[in-house]
Regions:
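Conserved N-proximal alpha/beta basic substrate-recognition cap immediately N-terminal to
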Residues: 1-49, 55
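ATP-grasp fold ATP-binding core
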Residues: 34, 57-80, 97-111, 116, ...
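Acidic/polar active-site rim loop that often engages polyanionic ligands
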Residues: 11-13, 33-39, 67-72, 141-146
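CheY-like receiver
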Residues: 55-56, 89
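Short amphipathic alpha-helical segments
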Residues: 4-8, 78, 118
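ATP-dependent carboxylate/phosphate-activation module, predominantly the ATP-grasp catalytic core
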Residues: 84, 107-167
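Phosphate- and divalent-cation-binding pockets in alpha/beta enzyme and binding domains
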Residues: 2-3, 88, 115
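Short beta-strand-to-turn element immediately C-terminal to the catalytic PLP-Schiff-base lysine
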Residues: 47, 77-82, 119-121
Length: 167
């Protein structure tokens, strides 16, 4: 995204700004944005070393997620259940960080994960598709299936659309 934003600016094409591209690419910037705009999100900490990550983990008193700041497709993402897990996964996770020698550790929230895909037009955001994710047992942070549907008997997709179309 940052490359597209930069080229679009140089070529005077309509696209995301470089600031918006950074926001969508850097998970710590997105978490800060959510906090500043009163959007509910998990507690988090940008960490440049394991000691800081362990300190945050102890404060949470429960599961956390360790992830690269700027990776996608769940590469380098691990559920942290005990402090030693940070030692085990730190190096592997940081290998997937493309532009910063830091990781994000955040509070783990139990539940179903959804993906909401959409498009931004001059009149606002329009949610186009919602998927319910199914995860591997061996690494529950990696989805093996995204089940797209227009309706779900167990969850209020209209509410998901409404929330996502708000911004």
């Amino acid at each position: 995204m940052p490359t597209i934003a930069y080229l679009s600016k140089e070529l005077k094409l309509s696209s995301l700004s470089e600031a918006d591209a950074a926001l969508y690419t850097d998970k710590s910037l997105m978490r800060k944005f959510c906090k500043e705009h009163s959007i509910s999100s998990p507690a988090f900490c940008k960490c440049t070393n394991m000691l800081k990550a362990k300190e945050f983990f102890r404060l949470q008193q429960g599961k956390c997620i360790l992830k690269p700041l700027d990776s996608n497709c769940s590469k380098g993402v691990f559920i942290i259940e005990k402090e030693n897990d940070i030692d085990q996964y730190w190096e592997e996770s940081i290998r997937f960080s493309k532009c910063d020698n830091a990781l994000l550790i955040e509070q783990y929230i139990e539940g179903v994960e959804f993906t909401v895909d959409g498009i931004v037009t001059p009149v606002g955001h329009k949610s186009l598709a919602i998927s319910e994710k199914r995860h591997y047992d061996y690494n529950p942070s990696i989805a093996y299936e995204l089940f797209f549907s227009n309706h779900n008997d167990n969850y209020d997709y209209e509410e998901l659309r409404k929330i996502n179309n708000y911004f």
